[in-house]
Amino acid sequence: MRPSGRNNDQLRNLKVTHNFTKHAEGSVLIEFGDTKVICTASVVAGVPEFKKDSGEGWLTAEYGMLPRSTHTRMDREAARGKQSGRTQEIQRLIGRALRASVDLTAIGENTIKVDCDVIQADGGTRTASITGASLAIADAIEYMKQNGMLDEQANPLLSQVAAISVGIYNNEPVLDLDYDEDSNAETDMNVVMNSNGGIIEIQGTAEGKDFSEEEFAKMLGLAKKGIKEIFATVF
C-alpha cells in the first residue's frame, strides 16, 4: 500500500492555473498533489552571442526553490553565492526538454526565458516544472502572435511536453512518487515525452538495489500511461 493510498498506476490530483502572474507573457501555476510550481515564460528580444545573426531564437530555463518550500527551511542559493549541482542539473534538463518542442527558427532572434519556482515541494518538482513550463511557453507563443511579434500563421510549437516520475517502491513499480515514496524508493526514474508519443529523456537511478529490464519496462509503461493522462487533462 502506498502512503497516500493511491493505486500504483494513479497520478496525484493535477491542477493548472493559467495567467497566474500578470507580467510574464506566459505563466502557469501547476499542482501535482502538494507539489506546486510557478512556471513563467518571458519573451526577450535578442539572443545569446553564439546565436547572433543565425536567424534562430533561443530557449533557456532556470529553476529554484523557495526557502520554505521544503519541510525545513533552506537558505536561498543567492545567499550561499552559488547554485547547487542539483539545481544546475535540473535547469539543464528543463531547457533540453523544452527546446525539443520549439522550432527556434520560427520565433526569430528572440529568447524565451523559462523560470520554474517551486513554492511547495512534495516530490516530482522537476517533472512538474517541465509540464508547467510547456504550458507557459504555449501561452507565450500565443501572446507573441496576438501582439505582432509573430505572424498569426506561424507555428513554432512542434509539440507539447510533459514529464512524470516513476519508481520501485516496496518492490512494486509506482507512478508519480510523492516525497515519502521518493525518499524510500529502491529506484527513481523521470520520463519526459512529447505529445506525439516520442521520448525526449529518461533519467533512472537505482538506490542501493538494481532494477531488472522487466521492471524498467513496467516503469516506462506506467510513465507512458501517466503522461497520456496529463496530456488529456491539461493540454
Curated annotation (Swiss-Prot):
Reaction(s) this enzyme catalyzes, per UniProt: tRNA(n+1) + phosphate = tRNA(n) + a ribonucleoside 5'-diphosphate
UniProt-listed GO biological process terms: rRNA catabolic process; rRNA processing; tRNA processing
Any GO MF annotation of the entry: tRNA nucleotidyltransferase activity
InterPro entries, per database record: ExoRNase_PH_dom1, ExoRNase_PH_dom2, ExoRNase_PH_dom2_sf, PNPase/RNase_PH_dom_sf, Ribosomal_Su5_D2-typ_SF, RNase_PH, RNase_PH_bac-type, RNase_PH_CS
Annotated keywords: Nucleotidyltransferase, RNA-binding, rRNA processing, Transferase, tRNA processing, tRNA-binding
Entry keyword annotation includes Nucleotidyltransferase: yes
Enzyme class: transferase
UniProt cross-references to Gene3D superfamilies, sorted A to Z: GHMP Kinase, N-terminal domain
PROSITE patterns: RIBONUCLEASE_PH
Pfam family, one: RNase_PH
EC numbers: 2.7.7.56
UniProt keyword Transmembrane, yes or no: no
NCBIfam families referenced in this protein's UniProt entry, alphabetically: RNasePH
The protein's assembly and partners: Homohexameric ring arranged as a trimer of dimers.
Function: Phosphorolytic 3'-5' exoribonuclease that plays an important role in tRNA 3'-end maturation. Removes nucleotide residues following the 3'-CCA terminus of tRNAs; can also add nucleotides to the ends of RNA molecules by using nucleoside diphosphates as substrates, but this may not be physiologically important. Probably plays a role in initiation of 16S rRNA degradation (leading to ribosome degradation) during starvation.
Family recorded in the similarity comment: Belongs to the RNase PH family.
Protein's recorded name: Ribonuclease PH
Origin species: Francisella tularensis subsp. novicida (strain U112)
Taxonomy of the source species: Bacteria, Pseudomonadati, Pseudomonadota, Gammaproteobacteria, Thiotrichales
Gene it is expressed from: rph
